[in-house]
Structure formats: C-alpha cells, structure tokens
C-alpha cells in the first residue's frame, strides 16, 4: 500500500512529517509502534475507503508514544 500512502500529505500536531511514508512502511511491516497523532491522521484519511489499512495501523499503533520521538520517557 506504499502508493496509497504517497498520494496523501500527512500532518501531525507539530506539522508536516516528511518521512511518514518510510515510517509507515517500516512500522506496519515490522509491527512497531506509530505515534498517536500520525495514526489518528491516517485513520481519518482512510476512514471512508481503506478500512483494511486502518486496522493495520490501529493494531500496530499505540497512543502511549510521545511525539518527541523518544520511546523511553
């Protein structure tokens, strides 16, 4: 679904995230966590059409990860 992700511009609470495409491909594939803000944006963006993609983000994502990028708080 790399092509689908590239067609959309994503915005987090701190602004546009250029590496989001690579981040999505990496996290969804490896099953790592995705910051809540990015996950929510993806959820709202694909809510109407790509329900399958939503499940992937929700299952692999978490809301406990800060936007600072630091996994350990």
UniProtKB/Swiss-Prot annotation:
Gene Ontology molecular function, alphabetical: aminopeptidase activity; dipeptidyl-peptidase activity; metallopeptidase activity
Enzyme Commission number: 3.4.14.4
BP GO terms, sorted: proteolysis
Catalytic reaction list: Release of an N-terminal dipeptide from a peptide comprising four or more residues, with broad specificity. Also acts on dipeptidyl 2-naphthylamides
Superkingdom classification of source: Eukaryota
Chain segments annotated as coiled-coil in the UniProt record: none
Compartments where found: Membrane
Keywords attached to this entry: Aminopeptidase, Hydrolase, Membrane, Metalloprotease, Protease, Transmembrane, Zinc
Cofactor(s) this protein requires: Zn(2+)
GO cellular component: a single term: membrane
Principal location listed in the UniProt entry: membrane
Cofactor binding: number and manner: Binds 1 zinc ion per subunit.
Enzyme class: hydrolase
Membrane topology: Multi-pass membrane protein
pH dependence of function: Optimum pH is 5.1.
Entry function: Degrades neuropeptide proctolin (RYLPT) by cleavage between Tyr and Leu residues.
Additional note from the record: Purified protein is present in 2 isoforms; 76 kDa and 80 kDa.
Assigned protein family: Belongs to the peptidase M49 family.
Identification of the protein by name: Dipeptidyl peptidase 3
């Amino acid at each position: 679904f790399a092509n689908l992700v590239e067609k959309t511009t994503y915005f987090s609470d701190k602004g546009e995230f250029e590496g989001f495409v690579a981040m999505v491909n990496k996290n969804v594939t490896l099953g790592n966590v995705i910051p809540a803000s990015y996950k929510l944006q993806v959820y709202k963006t694909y809510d109407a059409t790509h329900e399958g993609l939503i499940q992937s983000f929700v299952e692999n994502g978490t809301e406990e990860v800060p936007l600072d990028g630091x996994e350990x708080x």
